[in-house]
Regions:
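Catalytic core of non-heme Fe(II) oxygenases with the double-stranded beta-helix
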Residues: 120-197
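Short, Φ-rich (hydrophobic/aromatic) sequence segments
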Residues: 30-33, 153-156, 227-237
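Short, flexible loop/turn elements at secondary-structure junctions
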Residues: 22, 114-118, 130-132, 155-159, ...
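Signature of the catalytic double-stranded beta-helix
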Residues: 61-122, 138-145
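Residue-level detector of short, conserved catalytic/binding motifs and their immediate flanks
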Residues: 110, 149-151, 155, 202, ...
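Catalytic core of Fe(II)/2-oxoglutarate
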Residues: 177-244
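N-terminal auxiliary "cap/dimerization" subdomain that precedes the catalytic jelly-roll/cupin core
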Residues: 1-87
């Protein structure tokens, strides 16, 4: 853990983890996600990839107001059905980061990625990127918000039979800020890639400014699925504001 100019602890460029849910609790969350299946949004016409909840990197990128409208729709439902999960997440992050945590009423609660069985997921089709979706959101007190030390996290709820995980590269967003796509591809090839396997109920945290990718799956089975809780946090106005 390191300390920023605003005096808060933050996640360094390495990947951290903490046990958040028991396997039985993950099964409970999975059941709730399926009970809300009518609210899933299909995010790609060609593959079975869905979200449950408003996702800033998708919704605010198209039309910012659409993101806030979706958050207004989904937040009460997710809070009602999974309030205990959000309370535990905030409490454990507060312990880890040694600071207050909060959920802003205008921002989306952490939501879910849902990937159903598809052989295409064995290929490296997920983007290699840094998380900069916070730029799409209106932070009410920009001068009291630490944009240099964001946090991204994933909580595995259900995984394919042969597992799932995260690829990261020893590459920071400052190194890729002003380069072309072809230069970025070559730079990624020149850096070390590290694979972090997910475990059911384990929260994986990293700086969103570290270059990363959803790792390709292995030997997808017909009944496989990959369900994860996704979210981010920025230190703003004296607390870590958790959102998606």
């Amino acid at each position: 853990m390191l300390t920023s100019e605003l005096g808060c602890c933050y996640i360094s460029n390495t990947v951290s983890s903490l046990n958040l849910l028991a396997e039985k609790e993950c099964s409970q969350v999975r059941s709730t996600v399926y009970e809300l299946k009518e609210l899933w949004l299909k995010r790609n016409p060609d593959i079975p990839f869905y979200t449950l909840g408003a996702a800033s990197y998708l919704d605010a990128a198209i039309e910012p107001q659409d993101y806030y409208s979706k958050a207004l729709l989904y937040n009460p439902i997710l809070c009602d059905r999974l309030g205990w999960l959000y309370e535990r997440l905030a409490d454990r992050l507060a312990q880890l980061l040694k600071a207050r945590t909060s959920y802003h009423q205008n921002y989306a609660l952490p939501g879910f990625h849902v990937y159903l069985a598809c052989k295409l997921f064995e290929q490296p089709i997920a983007s290699i990127h840094c998380d900069s979706q916070y730029k799409l959101i209106n932070w009410e007190s920009g001068d009291r918000t630490d944009f240099n030390n964001p946090i991204s996290f994933t909580l595995a709820i259900s995984l394919p039979k042969f597992g799932g995980g995260l690829n990261t590269w020893n590459l920071h967003h400052q190194e890729i800020a002003n380069i072309s796509r072809s230069e970025f591809v070559q730079l990624v090839k020149s850096r070390t890639k590290t694979y972090y396997p997910y475990q059911i109920g384990e929260l994986i945290l990293h700086s969103g400014h570290t270059v990363h990718q959803i790792a390709p799956a292995k030997n997808i089975q017909p009944d496989d699925e990959r369900i994860t809780l996704q979210g981010h946090a920025l230190f703003s106005q004296g607390s870590w504001q958790i959102y998606w």
